[in-house]
């Protein structure tokens, strides 16, 4: 009766009182009263479940991260820099970093002689006009838009060569990897520029529009004429070199402040810890010169009636 009164009173006496009352009973009485035992077990289960849920919630709030299942055995190994400090990036690993070849010739130019070359050259010059009008000398925003476009051709070319390799059951000569490396490198340029520029909402909207139009246009172009597509990209890279050279002139003149380099750029290009914006733009420009050479070379190979797999791919630069 003491136990029943405790339950009816809504636990007014608390669990301690109830358990004390039960402990005073004769063992035979406890064994014979299955209802009381069931009620107590039920209350204990509710209490334990609530505590476990609270603990999990607490852990989630402390970590401020989604709970990840260990069932699949996927985990990030501990990765460190050369100095032993923890590697902070998930988007690229230490073995994917490199030092740009700053000795590359920035003045190389493919002189347009054939109709295809002239068409590619004029197309790029026409595309530059609205860019000059919209961005003028805001080279940070200009570079962001440029890298949004420049990261597309490598991905499109690599994807189509990948499908061709599967379809024809033949090797690509390393060109799939080379073009995808180019696309990833251009994407890292963009990620760096976003750290520097912090684009406004209308610039982000412009990026969406440009990417949608350019990706589909370049996809169709590459299907119809890969050699023309690579020639256009070669001339686009020449324009990129010019834009970054003007960017550096404004930094040298003081028109643009030579701020410290973003951490992501220091790690990706293996720059010194005291690197500045000028150092970042210098290595990015060197990358663009390399992409210029690769795409003009790819176009030359196909102009000669050969396939890309017949020529060695420049794999491993980045």
UniProtKB/Swiss-Prot annotation:
Amino-acid positions noted as binding Fe cation 1 in the UniProt annotation, renumbered to this chain: 147, 186, 189, 288
Q: State the Gene Ontology BP annotations.
A: alternative respiration
For activity, the cofactor(s) needed are: Fe cation
Q: Please list the reactions this protein catalyses.
A: 2 a ubiquinol + O2 = 2 a ubiquinone + 2 H2O
Pfam families in the cross-refs:
AOX (PF01786)
What's in the GO CC field? mitochondrial inner membrane
User: What does the UniProt function comment say about this protein?
Assistant: Catalyzes the cyanide-resistant oxidation of ubiquinol and the reduction of molecular oxygen to water, but does not translocate protons and consequently is not linked to oxidative phosphorylation. May increase respiration when the cytochrome respiratory pathway is restricted, or in response to low temperatures.
> What's the protein here called?
Ubiquinol oxidase, mitochondrial
């Amino acid at each position: 009766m003491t136990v029943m009164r405790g339950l009816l009173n809504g636990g007014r006496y608390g669990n301690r009182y109830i358990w004390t009352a039960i402990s005073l009973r004769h063992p035979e009485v406890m064994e014979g009263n299955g209802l009381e035992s069931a009620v107590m077990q039920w209350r204990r289960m509710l209490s334990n479940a609530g505590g476990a849920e609270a603990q999990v919630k607490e852990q989630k709030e402390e970590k401020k991260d989604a709970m990840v299942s260990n069932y699949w055995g996927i985990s990030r190994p501990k990765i460190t820099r050369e100095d032993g400090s923890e590697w902070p990036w998930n988007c690229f690993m230490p073995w994917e970093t490199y030092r740009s070849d700053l000795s590359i010739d920035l003045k190389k130019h493919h002189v347009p002689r054939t109709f295809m070359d002239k068409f590619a050259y004029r197309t790029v010059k026409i595309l530059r006009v609205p860019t000059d009008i919209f961005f003028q000398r805001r080279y940070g925003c200009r570079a962001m838009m440029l890298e949004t476009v420049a990261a597309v051709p490598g991905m499109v070319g690599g994807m189509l060569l990948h499908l061709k390799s599967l379809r024809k059951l033949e090797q690509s000569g390393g060109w799939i990897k080379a073009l995808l490396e180019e696309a990833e490198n251009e994407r890292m340029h963009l990620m760096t520029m976003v750290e520097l520029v912090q684009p406004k909402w209308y610039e982000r909207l412009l990026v969406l529009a440009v990417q949608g139009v350019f990706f589909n246009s370049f996809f169709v172009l590459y299907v119809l004429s890969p050699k023309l597509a690579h020639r256009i990209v070669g001339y686009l890279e020449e324009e990129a070199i010019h834009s970054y050279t003007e960017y550096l002139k404004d930094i040298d003149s003081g028109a643009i402040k030579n701020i410290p380099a973003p951490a992501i750029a220091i790690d990706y290009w293996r720059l010194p810890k005291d690197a500045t914006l000028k150092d970042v733009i210098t290595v990015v420009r060197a990358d663009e010169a390399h992409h210029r050479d690769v795409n003009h070379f790819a176009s030359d190979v196909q102009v000669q009636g050969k396939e890309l797999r017949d020529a060695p791919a420049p794999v491993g630069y980045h």
